[in-house]
C-alpha cells in the first residue's frame, strides 16, 4: 500500500536522510530500510513486528554494517548503500541513476501479520522501465538479507535471550531529493525545530530551520 496523503516529492526517506546528514544527489533514490521480525513458515513468512522487538541502536548498527559490507557498499551494476540510523530505522540509497522511485512499497507497521509474498515491492502500473528493475533489486536484497541476518552473532544473542530477532530488511517510502524553498526565502522568517524524530528534523533542514538536537533523545 503506498503512503497515503504524502506528496510524491516529500517522501519520508529523503527527509530522514537530511536529518541524518546523508547527502542525496540528483538521480539517487532513497528508501527507509527497517529491520523487521518474521514469524511462521520460512518459505511463507509473515511480518511479526516492524521493529525487530525494538532492537537497540548498537545491535542494529552491527547488522547494518554487515549488510552494507555484503550486499551494499555502492558496488555492482545496480548499487545500493546502507546507512545505520536509530533502533530499527535505517536508510538505503540507490546511487548511480539506475533506480526509479515509482515502486509500490508496503509500510511494515501497517502490515503486521501480513504475508511477505503479498507485500513485496512492485513497479507501479505504467511506470518507467527502471521501476521494474528497482523493484526486482529490492526484492533480491530482502531475500539475500534473511540468511545473512540469521547467521549474525547479534541475532544469535537475541535468540538465546528470548528476544525477537532482526530477520529481514524491509524497504518503503522511496523518493528523490525534493526541491523546496526555505521559510526565509518564501516568507522572510527564521526558526528552529526540536525533535527526536528524523522525519521532523529533516523537514526542518529543508525548511532552512536550525535543528536543535537533544542528547539521548530517540523518538521512541
Regions found by a protein language model. Give the residues of each.
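Active-site nucleophile/metal-coordination loop of metallo-enzymes that catalyze phosphate/sulfate
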Residues: 1-73
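Short glycine-rich loop/turn motifs
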Residues: 32-34, 89, 200
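Generic structural motif
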Residues: 38-42, 95-97, 174
Amino acid at each position: 500500500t503506498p503512503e497515503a496523503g504524502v506528496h510524491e516529492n516529500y517522501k519520508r526517506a529523503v527527509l530522514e536522510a537530511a536529518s541524518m546528514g546523508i547527502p542525496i544527489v540528483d538521480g539517487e533514490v532513497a528508501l527507509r530500510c527497517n529491520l523487521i521480525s518474521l514469524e511462521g513458515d520460512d518459505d511463507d513468512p509473515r511480518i511479526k513486528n516492524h521493529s525487530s522487538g525494538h532492537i537497540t541502536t548498537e545491535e542494529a548498527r552491527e547488522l547494518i554494517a554487515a549488510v552494507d559490507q555484503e550486499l551494499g557498499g555502492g558496488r555492482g551494476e545496480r548499487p545500493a548503500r546502507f546507512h545505520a540510523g536509530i533502533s530499527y530505522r535505517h536508510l538505503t540509497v540507490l546511487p548511480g541513476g539506475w533506480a526509479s522511485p515509482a515502486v509500490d512499497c508496503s509500510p511494515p507497521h501497517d502490515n503486521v501479520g501480513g504475508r511477505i509474498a503479498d507485500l513485496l515491492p512492485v513497479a507501479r502500473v505504467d511506470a518507467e522501465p527502471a521501476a521494474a528493475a528497482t523493484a526486482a533489486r529490492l526484492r533480491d536484497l530482502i531475500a539475500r538479507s534473511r540468511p545473512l541476518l540469521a547467521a549474525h552473532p547479534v541475532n544469535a544473542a537475541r535468540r538465546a535471550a528470548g528476544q525477537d530477532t532482526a530477520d529481514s530488511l524491509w524497504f518503503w517510502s522511496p523518493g528523490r531529493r525534493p526541491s523546496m524553498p526555505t521559510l526565509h526565502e518564501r516568507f522572510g522568517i527564521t526558526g528552529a525545530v526540536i525533535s527526536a524524530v528524523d522525519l521532523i528534523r529533516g523537514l526542518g533542514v529543508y525548511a532552512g530551520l536550525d535543528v536543535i538536537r537533544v542528547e539521548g533523545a530517540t523518538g521512541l
